């Protein structure tokens, strides 16, 4: 009851988003030290990222002190993508040093190829998945770059949900997962 309840209801989801950004980690070649957080000035993708939590992640990615230089946000709903682009414009992101793109992956013959093209084929440093959909998680795995960190943010309700990942890349490309 009252303002405190309302403010608390807004703070909890954002604290989850902030925690997610800080849970991401990266490693250095020949070192076992984990550098916590997203890659500053790196390449980030937010998949299925225009729902309420995804919008919070876009906001945080653009306005946080540690932000990517490239942010690609995907979804399969044009109306939601349009709304996200109105709330967080590429121009606003550019003022903060972030090149922002919104992409409808449903309209693409090969979403992985198209998304990796934003990185000149190198893949993304940080990828967040905001929907508990196995093919989406697998897509995220395929767009990771060297030392890429994949965060499965979406809490699945199905305890049997599983997806394939490239184990070779876990070992040789230093891919890692957090959730």
Locate the predicted segments by residue:
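Structural motif
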Residues: 36, 63, 118-119, 142, ...
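Adenosine-nucleotide cofactor-binding segment
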Residues: 41-42, 47-50, 58, 62-137
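Short regulatory "switch" loops immediately downstream of catalytic or recognition motifs
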Residues: 21-31, 84-90, 154
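Glycine- and charged-residue-rich phosphate/anionic-cofactor binding loop of Rossmann-like
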Residues: 6, 125, 175-179
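Residues forming the Rossmann-fold NAD(P)(H) cofactor-binding site
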Residues: 55
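Glycine-rich phosphate-binding loop and adjacent beta-alpha segment
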Residues: 85-96, 131-179
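Residue-level preference for short coil/turn positions at secondary-structure junctions
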Residues: 4, 40-41, 67, 123, ...
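NAD(P)H dinucleotide-binding glycine-rich loop of Rossmann-like/cofactor-binding domains
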Residues: 1-43
């Amino acid at each position: 009851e009252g303002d405190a309840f309302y403010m608390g209801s807004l703070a909890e989801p954002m604290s989850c988003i902030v925690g997610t950004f800080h849970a991401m980690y990266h490693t250095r070649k020949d070192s076992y030290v984990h550098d916590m957080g997203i890659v500053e000035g790196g390449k980030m993708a937010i998949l299925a990222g225009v729902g309420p939590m995804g919008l919070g992640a876009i906001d945080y990615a653009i306005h946080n002190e540690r932000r990517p230089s490239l942010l690609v946000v995907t979804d399969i709903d044009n109306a939601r993508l349009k709304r996200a682009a109105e709330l967080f414009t590429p121009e606003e992101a550019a003022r903060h040093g972030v090149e922002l793109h919104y992409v409808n992956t449903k309209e693409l013959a090969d979403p992985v190829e198209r998304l990796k093209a934003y990185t000149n084929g190198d893949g993304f440093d940080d990828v967040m998945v905001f929907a508990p959909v196995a093919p989406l998680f697998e897509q995220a795995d395929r767009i990771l770059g060297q030392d890429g960190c994949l965060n499965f943010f979406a809490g699945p309700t199905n305890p049997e949900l599983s997806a394939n990942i490239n184990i070779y890349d876990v070992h040789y490309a230093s891919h890692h997962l957090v959730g």
